[in-house]
Each structure stands twice: as C-alpha cells, then as structure tokens.
C-alpha cells in the first residue's frame, strides 16, 4: 500500500519544519543572540515558549521513528533476511528514538547530563543505525530504488559520521558556532535518511503479518485465521 511511503516523508517534514520553527521562535524572542554565534539546536529549544514546541516536535518524531524502525525490521524479515544485524539494527533504531525523546524533555539548562545522554543516542546511535541499514540494503533482495538507494545511504552515512567527528572537534576547540552548524547539518541528514525509507515502504503492499500459535508438537506451527494486511 503506497500510503506507507508517506510515513517516513511525514517524519522528515515534521522534524525539519519543527526544529526550524523552534529556531525562528528563539531568535525572534531574543532567547538566542545570533551576534554571539550560531546556536546549537538544544539551545534554541531550552527556554519557553519554544521549549514546549521543541518537546512536542521531538516526542512526535520519536514515535514516528519507532514506528518506522519496527516496520523496516519486519519488512527485511519478510524478505527472508533473518540476520542478527537486522535485530541489532532495530535495537539501534529504538534507542535513537528514545534519545530523541529524552533531548526534547530534558532541557540542557535543567538536566545537562541526561540531555547529553539523549543527544548521544539520537546522533551517534542514530548514525550507527543508518550504517546498519546501508549494509542491509545490499543484503536484502529485492533491492528497491534500483542501484541508487544503496550509494545514497552510504554517502549520507559517511557525511553524517564525518560531521559528528567535526562537531566534537570544534566543540573541544571552543569553536562553538562552527560546531553548532555541524550539528544542524547532521540533524538534516538524519531526517533525510529517515525520509529515504519511503522508497522501501512504497513496496509494502502484499506483505503480511501472521499471528501464529505454537502447537504441542515441536517444529509444527498452526497459523491462525487472523491475518493483518499492511
């Protein structure tokens, strides 16, 4: 069903528009001063009223991220790929979503350590998740998106990794403005990587989740009459 392809697109649009709206609010009400340098995303969402919008944007984004991660995991399994990598990838996707929610609910001005832990899950673990998805793209058949989707995911994952390293280096050198720019670009890349799942989800029509019940005899499975068409 082609409608599933809208889910990753909705996440990309929602998250991208949301954090830039938060940025606009923080600049317009003077919560951040651009003359001091370009602000980090978290700084823009620290103070009210934009902190309320920031939390809501990231909470909804986290929910959509969980939904997408689970569907992608099941899609890969339905294609006959039962690799451990797929299971680990699901765990990474869920941790990324958890970190995103933590960032939105624990502002750096109140709970800095918790906020940084959430940022690590959202950015670093999120980057690892998409590296795993890049590998799975080459493992799974059929390959949706032709010969382009794999290289695109690879290039975006490389760029994301490089920018995370640069963000940490510039922050260590006290070049906060440049570090913040790197952070914003990383966020945009991660949103784009989520949006690319629309290529895979476009082909979800015809796949089924079967509710199965174990029988008393090992290795025999009785399939129930309940079939969920996605």
Curated annotation (Swiss-Prot):
Extracellular-facing ranges: 23-50, 105-115, 172-183
One Pfam family hit: Frag1
Transmembrane regions listed in the UniProt entry: 2-22, 51-71, 84-104, 116-136, 151-171, 184-204
Keyword vocabulary terms for this entry: Autophagy, Cell membrane, Cytoplasmic vesicle, Endosome, Glycoprotein, Membrane, Transmembrane, Transmembrane helix
GO-annotated cellular components: autophagosome membrane; endosome membrane; plasma membrane
Main location: membrane
InterPro entries attached to this UniProt entry: DRAM/TMEM150_Autophagy_Mod (IPR050911), Frag1/DRAM/Sfk1 (IPR019402)
Record topological domains on the Cytoplasmic side: 1, 72-83, 137-150, 205-230
GO BP annotations listed: autophagy
Membrane topology: Multi-pass membrane protein
Compartments in which it is found: Cell membrane; Endosome membrane; Cytoplasmic vesicle, Autophagosome membrane
Domain of life: Eukaryota
Transport in keyword set: no
Glycosylation sites: 29, 33
Recorded family membership: Belongs to the DRAM/TMEM150 family.
Function: Modulator of macroautophagy that causes accumulation of autophagosomes under basal conditions and enhances autophagic flux. Represses cell death and promotes long-term clonogenic survival of cells grown in the absence of glucose in a macroautophagy-independent manner. May have some role in extracellular matrix engulfment or growth factor receptor recycling, both of which can modulate cell survival.
Protein name according to UniProt: Modulator of macroautophagy TMEM150B
Gene giving rise to this polypeptide: tmem150b
